[in-house]
């Protein structure tokens, strides 16, 4: 792709680094921004910079937050003894949109994937196990995607919990194998949480 402007080329190159954005889409987005008032572009730049500089991870669940505790963990009406284990913030948002879950979350920050060089130590598994051992959790709900990596991560955590009295369950398989949680419709996902099954049963299916 030939550019008549180095500034335009640089902006397109940076925009195309975003996931799912190719050069042509990046060019379209950059040209759109150029047509907008300068104030709007400045506000976008400011919002992104503030996000990058000030965003935090919740001290309790590792969800993305503006404060030390996210709004969910800080809400006294939530059931802190029930913890839903998810991969990332997108899964938290998907489950929250169902309105069917009133417990806390634990965001792992990914899934175990040896092919990608991601092992248990790269995830927030250790703090989760420590909370269980401290007696702060009664039930863990595994809500990772129905993929090989998701199942591997679930099983690894389950094995780490052997010897504890913790109840472990997993969302019902209304989510198709290979699907990411964020793409499930709200009704299906809500039912999967409500109709969750003991984790041991899921290993037999």
UniProtKB/Swiss-Prot annotation:
CDD domains: TOPRIM_recR (cd01025). SMART domains: TOPRIM. A zinc finger (C4-type) spans 58-73. It comes from the Bacteria. Gene3D superfamilies: 3.30.60.80, 3.40.1360.10, 6.10.250.240, RecR Domain 1. The keyword DNA repair applies. The keyword DNA repair applies. One of its GO terms (molecular function) is DNA binding. One of its GO terms (biological process) is DNA repair. Keywords: DNA damage, DNA recombination, DNA repair, Metal-binding, Zinc, Zinc-finger. Residues 81-176 form the Toprim domain. InterPro entries: DNA_Rcmb_RecR (IPR000093), Rcmb_RecR (IPR023627), Rcmb_RecR_Znf (IPR015967), TOPRIM_dom (IPR006171), TOPRIM_RecR (IPR034137). May play a role in DNA repair. It seems to be involved in an RecBC-independent recombinational process of DNA repair. It may act with RecF and RecO. Belongs to the RecR family. PANTHER family: RECOMBINATION PROTEIN RECR. This is Recombination protein RecR. The lineage of its organism: Bacteria, Pseudomonadati, Bacteroidota, Flavobacteriia, Flavobacteriales.
């Amino acid at each position: 792709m030939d550019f008549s402007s180095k500034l335009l080329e640089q902006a397109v190159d940076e925009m195309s680094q975003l996931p799912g954005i190719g050069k042509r889409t990046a060019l379209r987005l950059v040209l759109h921004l150029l047509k907008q008032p300068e104030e709007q572009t400045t506000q976008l730049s400011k919002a992104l910079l503030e996000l990058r500089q000030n965003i935090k991870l919740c001290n309790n669940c590792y969800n993305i937050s503006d404060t030390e505790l996210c709004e969910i963990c800080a809400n006294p009406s939530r059931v802190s003894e029930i913890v839903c284990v998810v991969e990332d913030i997108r899964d938290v948002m998907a489950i929250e949109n169902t309105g069917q879950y009133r417990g806390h979350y634990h965001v792992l920050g990914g899934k175990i994937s040896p092919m990608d060089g991601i092992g248990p130590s790269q995830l927030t598994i250790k703090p989760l196990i420590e909370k269980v051992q401290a007696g702060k959790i009664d039930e863990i709900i595994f809500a990772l995607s129905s993929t090989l990596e998701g199942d591997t991560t679930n099983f690894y955590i389950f094995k780490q919990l052997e010897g504890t009295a913790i109840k472990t369950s997993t969302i019902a398989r209304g989510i198709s194998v290979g699907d990411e949680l964020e793409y499930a419709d709200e009704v299906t996902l809500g039912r999967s949480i409500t109709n969750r099954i003991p984790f041991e049963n899921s290993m037999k299916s």
